[in-house]
Amino acid sequence: MKYLTSAQVRQMFLDFFKEKGHDVEPSASLVPHDDPSLLWINSGVATLKKYFDGRVIPENPRITNAQKSIRTNDIENVGKTARHHTFFEMLGNFSIGDYFKEEAIEWAWEFLTSEKWIGFDKEKLSVTVHPEDDEAYSYWKEKIGIPEERIIRLEGNFWDIGEGPSGPNTEIFYDRGPEYGDQPNDPELYPGGENDRYLEVWNLVFSQFNHNPDGSYTPLPKKNIDTGMGLERMVSVIQNVPTNFETDLFMPIIRATEKISGTEYGSHHEADVSFKVIADHIRTVTFAIGDGALPSNEGRGYVLRRLLRRAVRYAKQIGIDRPFMYELVPVVGDIMVDFYPEVKEKAAFIQKVVKTEEERFHETLNEGLSILEKVIDKAKSEGASTISGSDVFRLYDTYGFPVDLTEEYVEEQGLQVDLDGFEAEMERQRERARTARQQAGSMQVQDEVLGQITVDSTFIGYKQLSTETTIETIVLDKTVADYVGAGQEAKVILKETPFYAESGGQVADKGIIRGANGFAVVSDVQKAPNGQHLHTVIVKEGTLQVNDQVQAIVEETERSGIVKNHTATHLLHRALKDVLGEHVNQAGSLVSEERLRFDFSHFGQVTDEEKEKIERIVNEKIWQAIKVNISTKTLDEAKAIGAMALFGEKYGDIVRVVEVGDYSIELCGGCHVTNTSEIGLFKIVSESGIGAGVRRIEAVTGKEAFLFMAKQLDLLKETAATVKAKNVKDVPVRVEALQQQIRELQRENESLNAKLGNMEAGSLVNEVQKIEGVPVLAKAISGADMDGLRSIVDKLKQEIPSVVIVLGTASEGKVNIVAGVTKDLINKGYHAGKLVKEVATRCGGGGGGRPDMAQAGGKQPEKLQDALSFVYEYVKSIS
């Protein structure tokens, strides 16, 4: 067997299937952009679901890819086993209703055994098949020539992830030799068993059934092939190393980590686990951030945060106590540069994100210790000897606090950890993840009606908004029909259409279809599986029939607003990169008649100054009256002139390029103005964060921008009248004068409050009672706000050397409470924060604070007196 690098194996796989007539599908972003059911792209087939479920008919039914993927369901095993990973590459070949079992099996065998390709020894390969799949069994035995003893029937060889395509599968195993297992009594030592000797290198799935919503299975109209070969596992076999981590995909990362830690890989098992965790997790984090994900407390951002924190925790075990993961990002970029050059291009931004997150986690470890101390204090106060599993899990899951550290600290305090309870919480989390995967993985059941429509339909709406055309197809109630009558809604395909189908963020055109026998309103336009524009129409008068000659007319005013906003979106995208940095990528967009919405990746907030600069740049480009040039080019030609490809989009060999002078060049299939001057005006309406590392700008152009600014001016005029400014330009001066008056009144008020507080404190000194020998003052007073209460409590503590004080005031349906405890009584166990919390709870509120001073609020003023009486009970309980 010849030695191959991982890059060679990947390219060899794609080249092989390209020779077999497959189109090479580029590796899609890890962040799904058209599949809300998925947190991450988690397999090679995940990006092809639209083909398998019939929503889209591919140009070529034969597809191959090398797809980067993320799975985190077995994160606890990563580093501890030979082949568990959170990030991996899946090589696959797929047939959408074209070839089936015979070709899939024959080509797999050729690729694995031919000296031109991998060149495995045929005698080292075994296969498994489903017990009822006699067809596959026969192919392996009769055509390929594998002896019966190396063809194993296994019940588990059936691929089914819920509703949608499913079917039997066959797996190919490579025998690595007796050094990886040679115990004749081992019940798992066989291809398909749990062992390190027989490694699965390829899984061929024969999708021949639909798993229907009612649980039944019916044959698919078109049978499909879906195969998967894990690159990391395959390379470990070819490079003849014990685990995936010794391959050239991981070892450069491990060597770089050795230099940082001063510890040697292979020196002892515990250290090796740390090296493996770090190497795996930095690959995942690097690629995910490169594809637009950012650390956060929810969704995929939470996954990144958890992976980074897990790696940092393991790094401590090999002597690394500082941020370091960011230093490994360029190493990952160098390893993967042949197939994923974008990682190296984005390395600086990825490093910035990783370093910031590492620094935060080092602070979080300290925060976790603080939380743990409170948990321990609570357990002791309740007389418990064990820290609950739920508390341990919360520390681990929310704060990233290691369980072993929790155990260590807890044992130092003479307590124990409920590890069984912790494991139960972990299992509940795993079950939630399993359920989510099952729900996310299911594909839609194939809908054959639209997929079978193959009539030609041409979009002519770039240059004209109306045309004489013919009705080619009518779909009524999911059935192909000859006509549709008044009051009915149907889907219509026209021979030529000026109506734009919703895509790329641009909304569909609206308008009318008028014929000799009736007319209909077009309310929506989507793309059918075979690419035709599918018009949703409601017939208002008469009937529309197949083969009718009709006039299709787009609503011109609406399209005019759309094109202005679409070109403005391109200008905005470029301006964002110019002002915020090249890391900015489109994360979503909406282009309608009234407004545009643009979501983009950005790590941090956008300042007012940055927003003003972005807005100014866009308007300058509008006022420069730049010509917009639209052309078609090959993808390579477009890239050569610097065309910006949108994040997560798929492009063919021929692409449409929209150039706004030399300022903005993007690949785009949408509708645009011919000159930027047509946009007129651009105004940002709002900017906000909508998720982890994703910001949103909403803006208006042209007439809508004018109306927005006119409305803002009206508000300013109203403000001028309110503050009694002579005209709008005097508003800032007038507001500043009013603010100065307010500040002076506040100072006077504070001075009066201080005097009143001193008087109040003087009168309250005489109301101190002794409870069990402890001076206590619990009193409701009037006329003081929270600041006033604090001032009075401070004054009383100065005048009374030893005292517990709780003062409350009720006003306008709210309660304010302040508690204070002198230092001598704190040493005896009295705590203002705990006391004020108890008092506030009794009048419908909450709060807390330091042992010496704390405040709280409540919502039930009528219960304040009863709540204050609790203070005396509290003092007795401590005494």
UniProtKB/Swiss-Prot annotation:
Function: Catalyzes the attachment of alanine to tRNA(Ala) in a two-step reaction: alanine is first activated by ATP to form Ala-AMP and then transferred to the acceptor end of tRNA(Ala). Also edits incorrectly charged Ser-tRNA(Ala) and Gly-tRNA(Ala) via its editing domain.
A single GO cellular-component term on record: cytosol
Protein name listed in UniProt: Alanine--tRNA ligase
Binding site for Zn(2+): H566, H570, C668, H672
Annotated SUPFAM superfamilies: Class II aaRS and biotin synthetases, Putative anticodon-binding domain of alanyl-tRNA synthetase (AlaRS), ThrRS/AlaRS common domain, Translation proteins
Pfam families associated with the record: DHHA1, tRNA-synt_2c, tRNA_SAD
Protein family according to the UniProt entry: Belongs to the class-II aminoacyl-tRNA synthetase family.
Example GO biological process: alanyl-tRNA aminoacylation
Keyword tags: Aminoacyl-tRNA synthetase, ATP-binding, Cytoplasm, Ligase, Metal-binding, Nucleotide-binding, Protein biosynthesis, RNA-binding, tRNA-binding, Zinc
The protein's Enzyme Commission number: 6.1.1.7
Cofactor descriptive note: Binds 1 zinc ion per subunit.
Enzyme class per UniProt: ligase
Main localization (coarse): cytoplasm
Keyword Protein biosynthesis: yes
Coiled coil: none
SMART domains for this protein: tRNA_SAD
Catalytic activity, as annotated: tRNA(Ala) + L-alanine + ATP = L-alanyl-tRNA(Ala) + AMP + diphosphate
InterPro entries: aa-tRNA-synth_II/BPL/LPL, Ala-tRNA-lgiase_IIc, Ala-tRNA-ligase_IIc_anticod-bd, Ala-tRNA-synth_IIc_core, Ala-tRNA-synth_IIc_N, Ala-tRNA_ligase, Ala_tRNA_ligase_euk/bac, DHHA1_dom
Signal peptide: none
GO terms, molecular function: alanine-tRNA ligase activity; aminoacyl-tRNA deacylase activity; ATP binding; catalytic activity, acting on a protein; transferase activity; tRNA binding; zinc ion binding
Cofactor(s) needed for function: Zn(2+)
Domain notes: Consists of three domains; the N-terminal catalytic domain, the editing domain and the C-terminal C-Ala domain. The editing domain removes incorrectly charged amino acids, while the C-Ala domain, along with tRNA(Ala), serves as a bridge to cooperatively bring together the editing and aminoacylation centers thus stimulating deacylation of misacylated tRNAs.
Domain of life (superkingdom): Bacteria
Localization of this protein: Cytoplasm
